[in-house]
Every structure is written in structure tokens, then in C-alpha cells.
Design a protein with these regions (language model features):
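Class I Rossmann-like S-adenosyl-L-methionine
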Residues: 1-105
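Rossmann-like S-adenosyl-L-methionine
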Residues: 73-207
Length: 207
């Protein structure tokens, strides 16, 4: 165990009496000046403080229920059945989202292997809903990467139509293939492109 030196003990004593509200906001929120200034573009000083404080907390663990195979209610029950220190609750905004309180080894669960859910933050889930894709449409996801949002869009399309997943990284697209296989979606078509001017994109013009 580390034994405090006299100088360290005195510093801790002084630190414990500091009023955080009296500190410079850059120090209080552990932010560089440029980022603090950028947060100032949003209305209200309280909003800026909330944004800054949120960066000091670990990211939340959110799941998206794959509605081709299950629903949120069943996924909640499945996750809560894991027991231990974990608790599953609905995400506040995304209708198919489940928030996990804790860090379980999800890759080892039956639900993950069966493609019943994807690890996906609530914001990304909401983007798919904002797009509002319809059954039978043709949709292109540029910069699809490993395909998290692509798979969310594909599920909303109920595996109909054609959903192209474009990306300039073959490595990232390769990560989409096992995820697509687990999801059960047949309307997703990963396509490598070399740029936004790739001939593969131009062939879709007017369709």
C-alpha cells in the first residue's frame, strides 16, 4: 500500500476544501479551451456544463433488439435472466433499445450468437428511425463501416428491398459479414468503393 508523504497529505487536505463551482470551468470539467468554446454554441450555460460532465462518465452499454428474431420485451427478460450484478432496462427513446447496467460478457450469450441483438448506442438506433426506410425501397448507406446502422435499417425494411452498404475500407466491411449472417437479413449488400465517384455508385443513378 502507498503511504502518503507529508506534502501529499497536506495537498489532499487543501483539495478537500475546494469548492468546485469556484474553479475555472476548464479545470472543473477537465476540457481543452477549444472544446469548451464549442459547447458554448448550444443555448444555456447549464447545457454546456451537462455536456462537459457527460464526457467524464463511461459510455452506456446499449443493445438493439433484432426485430427479425425477437422484440424488446423478450430481450429485456433474457438479459435480466443473466443475473449477477447486471440489470436491463428500456432505453428512454429508441423503441427497440435495451440499456445494460453493468458489463456482461455478451458475446458468450445464446442471444448474441443467435443474432437476437446488436450492441449499438441509442443515438445510432435513432438515426435509423429518423431515416424511416420503407419496405421494398432501395437504400444506400455511405460509410457503412462494420454495418451497425445498416443492420438497423435492414430490420426496419423487414429484409425487403435492396440495402447497399458502401465503404472505402474492405477491412471494416469484412466485419459486417458475420454480423449480417447472425442477423438473418437478406437485403443487405456490402460493396467496397474506392471513392464517392466510384462507378458502382453511378450505376445506381436514377433507380
Amino acid at each position: 500500500a502507498h503511504v502518503l508523504k507529508p506534502g501529499e497529505y497536506e495537498w489532499l487536505q487543501r483539495f478537500s476544501t475546494v469548492d468546485p463551482s469556484a474553479l475555472n470551468p476548464l479545470v472543473r470539467n477537465n476540457l481543452p479551451e477549444w472544446l469548451w468554446d464549442a459547447f458554448g454554441k448550444y443555448p444555456g450555460e447549464e447545457t454546456r456544463e451537462e455536456l462537459a460532465k457527460s464526457l467524464m462518465h463511461p459510455a452506456l452499454l446499449d443493445l438493439r433488439a433484432n426485430t427479425m428474431k425477437t422484440n424488446r420485451e423478450d430481450l429485456l427478460a433474457q438479459m435480466n435472466a443473466l443475473g449477477g450484478r447486471y440489470q436491463a432496462i428500456p432505453t428512454p427513446y429508441a423503441p427497440d433499445g435495451v440499456r445494460i447496467m453493468g458489463k456482461p460478457a455478451l458475446q458468450n450469450t445464446v442471444g448474441f450468437k443467435a443474432g437476437m441483438f446488436e450492441v449499438q448506442d441509442e443515438g445510432s438506433q435513432l438515426l435509423a428511425y429518423l431515416l424511416a426506410p420503407k419496405r421494398g425501397e432501395m437504400v444506400v448507406d455511405f460509410c457503412a463501416g462494420a454495418g451497425g446502422k445498416t443492420l438497423a435499417i435492414g430490420a426496419l425494411m423487414r429484409s425487403t428491398g435492396r440495402l447497399y452498404a458502401f465503404d472505402t475500407s474492405e477491412r471494416r466491411l469484412a466485419n459486417l459479414k458475420p454480423r449480417q449472417a447472425r442477423s438473418g437479413l437478406s437485403n443487405v449488400h456490402p460493396v467496397w468503393i474506392d471513392s464517392e465517384n466510384d462507378a458502382k455508385i453511378k450505376r445506381l443513378a436514377g433507380k
